[in-house]
Curated annotation (Swiss-Prot):
InterPro entries: Ribosomal_uL16, Ribosomal_uL16_bact-type, Ribosomal_uL16_CS, Ribosomal_uL16_dom, Ribosomal_uL16_sf. The lineage of its organism: Bacteria, Pseudomonadati, Pseudomonadota, Betaproteobacteria, Neisseriales. NCBIfam families: rplP_bact. Binds 23S rRNA and is also seen to make contacts with the A and possibly P site tRNAs. Pfam families: Ribosomal_L16. One of its GO terms (molecular function) is structural constituent of ribosome. Belongs to the universal ribosomal protein uL16 family. PANTHER family: 50S/60S RIBOSOMAL PROTEIN L16, LARGE RIBOSOMAL SUBUNIT PROTEIN UL16M. It comes from Laribacter hongkongensis (strain HLHK9). Keywords: Ribonucleoprotein, Ribosomal protein, RNA-binding, rRNA-binding, tRNA-binding. Coiled coil: none annotated. This is Large ribosomal subunit protein uL16. Transmembrane segments: none annotated. The gene is rplP. Part of the 50S ribosomal subunit.
Length: 138
């Protein structure tokens, strides 16, 4: 599971996920990409589940890049605990996703295979996505 190894602070404020992605919006490494159309949070488990679905489908061929990293801790208090007494302990890690963010990239496979692999991966994710192809000269 993906999570940071060294942290300056263990817990963060909730914040608001607004705006659109300005960085990490183009296909940079592979030939095909899975781009976020909606906004939301991807947990480390969801990122891994989608990666596994793609890897199983393309079998031995191709290479996959994960372009997002879950660097935000989400805390949770235990069940039936009274309010107050500080912030809960870290439960899991998420990546905040804005529209336009490239989630995964792939190369070394045909477009049909990549399209199907990304379709299987998108089924594991809670946000709307689209398939993109690298533009010539990009």
């Amino acid at each position: 599971m993906l999570q940071p190894t060294r942290l300056k602070y263990r817990k963060v404020h909730k914040g608001r996920n607004t705006g659109i992605a300005t960085r990490g919006t183009k296909v940079s490494f592979g030939d095909f990409g899975l781009k976020a159309v909606g906004r939301g949070r991807l947990t480390a488990r969801q990122i891994e589940a989608a990666r596994r679905a793609m890897t199983r489908h393309i079998k031995r061929g191709g290479r996959i890049w994960i372009r997002v990293f879950p660097d935000k801790p989400i805390t949770k208090k235990p069940a039936e605990v009274r309010m107050g007494n500080g912030k809960g302990s870290v439960e899991y890690w998420v990546a905040e996703i804005q529209p336009g963010k490239m989630l995964y990239e792939m190369e070394g496979v045909s477009e049909e295979l990549a399209r199907e692999a990304f379709r299987l991966a998108a089924a594991k994710l809670p946000i709307a996505t689209t398939f993109v192809v690298r533009q010539v000269g990009q």
